[in-house]
Amino acid sequence: MKIGDLVRVTSKNNDYFGEIGIITKQLNNFFVYAMIPSGEFIFSPEGLEVIG
């Protein structure tokens, strides 16, 4: 997963489940920023799926 990747929120425990966004910043190996329609949030890569 790298900056600019198109991702979908796949964690069903997340309020943003199913939303599609773009990785905007990688903080470290454990967290990334993703811009989704609801805003820009920090996610764990395990809760995201690269789709493009």
Cite the ranges covered by each PLM segment:
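Basic/aromatic-rich interaction segments and small domains that mediate binding to polyanionic partners
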Residues: K2-G52
